Amino acid sequence: MPGTKRYQHVIETPEPGEWELSGYEAAVPITEKSNPLTRNLDKADAEKIVKLLGQCDAEIFQEEGQIVPTYQRLYSESVLTTMLQVAGKVQEVLKEPDGGLVVLSGGGTSGRMAFLMSVSFNQLMKGLGQKPLYTYLIAGGDRSVVASREQTEDSALHGIEELKKVAAGKKRVVVIGISVGLSAPFVAGQMDYCMDNTAVFLPVLVGFNPVSMARNDPIEDWRSTFRQVAERMQKMQEKQEAFVLNPAIGPEGLSGSSRMKGGGATKILLETLLLAAHKTVDQGVVSSQRCLLEILRTFERAHQVTYSQSSKIATLMKQVGISLEKKGRVHLVGWQTLGIIAIMDGVECIHTFGADFQDIRGFLIGDHSDMFNQKDELTNQGPQFTFSQDDFLTSILPSLTETDTVVFIFTLDDNLTEVQALAERVREKCQNIQALVHSTVGQSLPAPLKKLFPSLISITWPLLFFDYEGTYVQKFQRELSTKWVLNTVSTGAHVLLGKILQNHMLDLRIANSKLFWRALAMLQRFSGQSKARCIESLLQAIHFPQPLSDDVRAAPISCHVQVAHEKEKVIPTALLSLLLRCSISEAKARLSAASSVCEVVRSALSGPGQKRSTQALEDPPACGTLN
């Protein structure tokens, strides 16, 4: 409610909204709910899409409201207190680095964020002449950083084995497990293992659902559900032997797309507490709440500065949409860690939108020799694992066409001679060359370089006078800003292409168990039919043309995922079959003849005899079995 905010904010955060009401999609976790702000996202133009997604991102900084039930938020006293406690535990490792380690771990987007942050904080420590103490784990290994391999996060044992390898011989290990929806088995196994070995390990769980909404279906290779693991951690938190950091940040602008707000909030929360730990460790004091609030406000400022460029972001979105509509390709060429953000955005479009890996791709310009755990995993693995400057020059530049779009992403502190030389080579092949440029007050883009870009988004940051660790605030701001711009552009471009129904992505690839349950929830939502009927239709679409046997029906979810993640249009096929009461083959034929997946589904939804609520879900599709 107005006037209830405890802290002074840089941006105008939304008041608590409809999604907080106890009856709103009650069967669905917050991270999987549909956001009321974007209910009509599919009807919005580019400018409106930017505005709506910007409002969703602002919800990260929203304080607790007066509506019951009240979820704890990023600025809640309980969350800030836990952040300080975790920062103190990290400081213990920093003060006695011999035998110490900080592990950041996750699957998919969360694992890529773990990679990015471990790179950043190791760079920070090297700059101080200190031995780097951070490492990362990502489900599926280093190949999952640069390619879509979301199915690898479904094994708890895989997570434990990877943790044992990096922690071998260490005396004190802080393990920060990131799972936006509190659902990834890869992380659950690690947290359980840490709680069984507290003499060495301190587990910290980061996610954005209440523990009561953590996934509660059985993990195929583990003894506990994710919810049981999280509940155990809550009990151990009383003795500070484990911690759970799980503020609510509201539903995603595109339902369930945790690469967006979930990824951004992960970055904000962890960089705030880790930077606070580093800033105060030499002063011999534990980080203060004031220190946390100062850093959080700089991230709020990043939101303000980024979305002040909304009209230019919309222009870039439209250009990217045009390229994709014409079957062209979009190349995001980023310098240093901005290149990592670019790679992440491209990779995540594959399972989110059912995109081809070549549709939107990121490339990293700069030295990455000491970033990866196992760089050999990325050598000679095929075109979908290419991401370097050499890869761009040899495999992309020669084949650029006029339907492609190339976006340069850099700061004015980067090597501008190098930027200009590459931009000139690209301009010889392709006129659709854009730029996202970060500068500090007083810096200006050289005229010869500026002329190369017909359109550019120029984001100017205020001067910050911080100590050495504090200079990383601006680096983190620029990364977050770049993430917001690219996520908004790639999401919006797919909205403009007609890929979205309301604020749901129907044509996502079912790449892991989380996406299997999301697919089932969408079928229930839009068909209004029973859970059993929706399961039957989903399995028929997955295994087509093979008929469903009782053995197939009884198979573990991992077996269905293994088949589904190689197939396209599984969910639309199943939904059409339900809506039209037709066979899978007839549904596939209708989709093949249609210009847009969502248009043919809309037509079926508005057909005679279709009586259903698109808001109502029957039972939570997280029961653990398909019976």
UniProtKB/Swiss-Prot annotation:
Its main location: cytoplasm. GO terms for molecular function: carbohydrate binding; enzyme binding; enzyme inhibitor activity; fructose-6-phosphate binding; glucose sensor activity; kinase binding; kinase inhibitor activity; protein domain specific binding. Beta-D-fructose 6-phosphate binds at residues 109-110, 179-181, 514. Gene3D superfamilies: 1.10.8.1080, 3.40.50.12620, Glucose-6-phosphate isomerase like protein, domain 1. Residues 199-200 are annotated as: Important for interaction with GCK. GO terms for biological process: carbohydrate derivative metabolic process; glucose metabolic process; intracellular glucose homeostasis; protein import into nucleus; protein localization to nucleus; response to fructose; response to glucose; triglyceride homeostasis. Beta-D-fructose 1-phosphate binds at residues 109-110, 153, 179-181, 348, 514. Detected in liver (at protein level). Not detected in muscle, brain, heart, testis, intestine or spleen. Keywords: Carbohydrate metabolism, Cytoplasm, Mitochondrion, Nucleus, Repeat. Residues 90-286, 320-499 form the SIS domain. GO terms for cellular component: cytoplasm; cytosol; mitochondrion; nucleoplasm; nucleus. It is found in: Cytoplasm; Nucleus; Mitochondrion. The keyword Nucleus applies. Fructose 1-phosphate and fructose 6-phosphate compete for the same binding site. Regulates glucokinase (GCK) by forming an inactive complex with this enzyme. Acts by promoting GCK recruitment to the nucleus, possibly to provide a reserve of GCK that can be quickly released in the cytoplasm after a meal. The affinity of GCKR for GCK is modulated by fructose metabolites: GCKR with bound fructose 6-phosphate has increased affinity for GCK, while GCKR with bound fructose 1-phosphate has strongly decreased affinity for GCK and does not inhibit GCK activity. Interacts (fructose 6-phosphate bound form) with GCK. This is Glucokinase regulatory protein. It comes from Rattus norvegicus (Rat).
